[in-house]
Structure formats: structure tokens, C-alpha cells
Amino acid sequence: MALYRTKELVSLVSIMFVLLATNIEALSFNFPKITPGNTAITLQGNAKILANGVLALTNSTQIPPTTTFPSTGRALYSTPVPLWDSATGNVASFVTSFSFVILNPSGRVPTDGLVFFIAPPDTEIPNNSQSQYLGVVDSKTSINRFVGLEFDLYANSFDPYMRHIGIDINSLISTKTVRYNFVSGSLTKVTIIYDSPSNTLTAVITYENGQISTISQNVDLKAVLPKDVSVGFSATSTIAVSHNIHSWSFTSNLEATTGNIVSQV
């Protein structure tokens, strides 16, 4: 875990302001709550939007709560996001922030987890992706195309021996990890920044107790993903663990040959 120094925080905030000020080809949306009937979000699997403005990715109402009942749910922004421009080769920079709560009412050792991911625009829940595969990886094939930030509750054979936050590139064998200080029922806030000139993906994780962790990895998104992508969340659980998104915002800017702004508030 890395503590965030003031100079580094100012640098990241500066990047955020640059992104927000550049109106070349941009997409922006902000959901302080995610209300039922929101057509800007596509639900897959067990995901549903609750009346209180929470996006529930997995089922958590099994009775008794100790029952083993696998659940997989995903939620995607319905509009494809321009990631890179084929004419210029330019790649978008973006900032996304979200908050979530994972609740483990059974008291058993929680399993599986949640991932924010970027994938091809036609992405669906893969076959063989339940449980430890977090709804993004088909365990029967090596062809999986995505970039993600995972919050993993359980150490599987391919994981570090701890609950962890990991940056994933086409695999759940994370390229970089830090410890995930999970507390059932607590609100976690996340900001992810991709700086395209440096190909740097950075995440800042703020826990409810004020503790801050960071994780960063160099990744060329143009080499991994198509020019238009889907962005969203996926979660899996094997017991009655709920993975709930409370808020989500996203802003991207791409220097392209023609420009427009797409906004959803």
C-alpha cells in the first residue's frame, strides 16, 4: 500500500482539470445515484437497479445466507466510448470515479469480488466466468480482451496470498497488486486516471476510515483494445455477498480529426 503525497495528488488533480477543459472529442456522464429506468446503463446477468438508487451487481437475498448460490452480474454504459482514433493514432485520456459497498451478511469468508473493466463494445458475460473469474474471463480459453481494476476478496491459486486490488490486462493474473483492506458494509471511493501521453493507468482508493492506497501501471490501451469500447462493472459471488455501486462518473477526451461532445448527466 502506498500513501499519497501532496505533490503527487496535485499532479493527478491537474490532469483531471486538463481532461475536463479539453473539448475535442469527449464523452462525459455523472450518476450521483443510479435510479431505476436508467436507459444509459445496460444490465447483464443478475445485475439490477434498486429503488434506493443503488446498482446491485450480485444477488444477496438467498435464504439462509450461508447457502452456496453463485451469482454473476455486470453493468455497462450503453454508449460505446471512443478510445483511439484510427486516422491520427491518438489515444483518449480519461478519468472515472465510483463508490461501492460490498456487504457480507453471512459472516463466512467472503469470496469473489468486483472489477471495473474496459472491453470491446459487444462484450457479454463470457462462458465459464463465474466465481473467481469475476464475470470477465472465460476460464476455458486464453483469449480474453479487457483491461480492469479488480477488488478481489479471495486468494485463488493464481492470486497473491491476500485480498487485493489488481490491475488486469487480458488476464486475472494481475500485473500489479496492492492489499485490499476490505471491511464489510463500508463505502469505498475510487478514482481511475488514464494519461495517454505516458500510457499510465493510476487508481486512487479511499476507504471509509480515510486511509488511501494507490496503484499504477504502464499500459498501451491501443495495443490491447479496439478503437471503441464499453466501460462498466462486473462482480461475482459464490455465497450471499452483495456488490453495490452507489455512484459513477466518467469523462474522456480524445484528440481526433473531428470533434464532438457527448454528455449524459
UniProtKB/Swiss-Prot annotation:
CDD domains: lectin_legume_LecRK_Arcelin_ConA. Keywords: Calcium, Glycoprotein, Lectin, Manganese, Signal. InterPro entries: ConA-like_dom_sf (IPR013320), L-lectin (IPR016363), Legume_lectin_dom (IPR001220), Leguminous_Lectin (IPR050258). One of its GO terms (molecular function) is carbohydrate binding. Residues 1-21 form the signal peptide. Glycans are attached at residues 59, 127. The keyword Signal applies. Most highly expressed in the epidermal layer of developing shoot tips. It comes from the Eukaryota. The keyword Manganese applies. Belongs to the leguminous lectin family. Monomer. This is Non-seed lectin. It comes from Pisum sativum.
